[in-house]
């Protein structure tokens, strides 16, 4: 967490703009893409009080630390596969998250997410007193919806609004050095989590069994992503 201290004091409006510019520079989105506006249901960062900004910044620091920790653990798997000389011939699919950014804690965020879901939103003064607990075993925190919206750039809305791409799009990284040669290449084809199992079966040359232990199997939704 400490590596991210002070990295988010600019707020979610500016973070979203900065992310949008980097996405264009990397070619992740078209050069002529336009950034969607913040919905009125999401507070502007400058409309928060100073204490609210302190708590919100810490929550994003902790979230970023969690992502770095996740990357490190995935990296350990990569290290082992490389040490065993198996990585180049391994189809490695890295998919973190099942929706867009989580906005369930509302504009205030929460250091007790389950309590907030029951309508027991803790006041900002109490959150401030719990600042050092966030990210530890005594906290079940969830950042304010503004951060979810910012990290969903360039799309509108958050996980709770599945009718918009900000609610459903997630990044996915696929590695298979013996078969995928354009390292860092981008793919624009539509894909869904339902496509993962058909892709793995296609990669190893296996068909889905019609019967398992005498039970006829339903066909899988989804299609192989190998052609992409």
Question: Model-flagged regions — what are they?
Answer:
Residues 35-38, 48-56, 106, 196:
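Long, internal low-complexity/basic segments
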Residues 2, 13-48:
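Long, well-ordered, tryptophan-enriched scaffold segments
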Residues 3-7, 25, 50, 79, ...:
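Substrate-binding rim/cap in mid-to-C-terminal beta-strand-loop elements of soluble/periplasmic
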Residues 42-59, 175-181:
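Short glycine/proline-rich turn/loop motifs
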Residues 5-22, 52-90, 101-103, 107-148:
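A long, amphipathic alpha-helix that forms part
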Residues 88-94, 172:
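Beta-sheet entry/capping signal
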């Amino acid at each position: 967490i400490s590596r991210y201290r002070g990295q988010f004091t600019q707020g979610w409006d500016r973070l979203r703009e900065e992310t949008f510019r980097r996405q264009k520079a990397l070619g992740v989105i078209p050069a002529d893409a336009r950034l969607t506006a913040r919905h009125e249901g999401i507070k502007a960062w400058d409309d928060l009080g100073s204490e609210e900004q302190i708590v919100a910044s810490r929550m994003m620091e902790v979230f970023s630390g969690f992502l770095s920790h996740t990357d490190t653990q995935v990296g350990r798997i990569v290290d082992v596969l490389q040490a065993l000389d198996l990585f180049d011939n391994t189809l490695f699919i890295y998919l973190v998250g099942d929706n867009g950014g989580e906005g369930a804690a509302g504009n205030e965020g929460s250091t007790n997410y389950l309590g907030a879901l029951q309508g027991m939103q803790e006041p900002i003064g109490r959150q401030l007193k719990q600042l050092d607990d966030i990210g530890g075993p005594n906290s079940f925190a969830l950042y304010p919806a503004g951060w979810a919206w910012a990290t969903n750039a360039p799309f509108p809305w958050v996980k709770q609004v599945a009718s918009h791409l900000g609610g459903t799009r997630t990044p996915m990284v696929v590695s298979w050095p013996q078969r995928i040669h354009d390292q860092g290449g981008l793919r624009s084809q539509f894909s869904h989590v339902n496509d993962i199992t058909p892709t793995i079966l296609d990669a190893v040359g296996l068909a889905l069994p019609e019967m398992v232990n005498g039970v006829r199997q339903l066909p899988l939704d989804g299609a192989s992503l190998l052609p992409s």
